[in-house]
Amino acid sequence: MAGPGWTLLLLLLLLLLLGSMAGYGPQKKLNLSHKGIGEPCRRHEECQSNCCTINSLAPHTLCTPKTIFLQCLPWRKPNGYRCSHDSECQSSCCVRNNSPQELCTPQSVFLQCVPWRKPNGDFCSSHQECHSQCCIQLREYSPFRCIPRTGILAQCLPL
């Protein structure tokens, strides 16, 4: 008669034998990727992270890490770079500046894209055009200009 220890050992050996024969379902291909983060690549499979994306302004792809949600995200432009759409920017904010070009700009504290506004001294036609939100006519026949807010309550008053 075999003791409980021998019975348990025989059961474990039987399970190991059955497991190796069954192969635990379909066999997966071994990941033969060898490239680390930052190395040039052509396909996702070449990278240890399984993530090969455009990672700069240069038209080449590099192995990049996945996000915490296991997604491969393409490189996006930092603030100050020219853009034509919000999706091109890290901040998701592509805003027109004083020339006809648009630039990636940071989001506000409230995660909004703040449009470019004219600096003090520039000509304007409405308060919304000015960084100070203050567009007034300094003299009766002078053009409207952006001016800084003044006074204790920072009101839009002529200087």
Curated annotation (Swiss-Prot):
Keyword entries, A-Z: Glycoprotein, Signal
InterPro entries, per database record: Colipase (IPR001981)
Glycosylation sites: 31
Record keyword Signal present: yes
Transmembrane regions: none
Pfam family membership, one: Colipase-like
This protein's name: Leucine-rich colipase-like protein 1
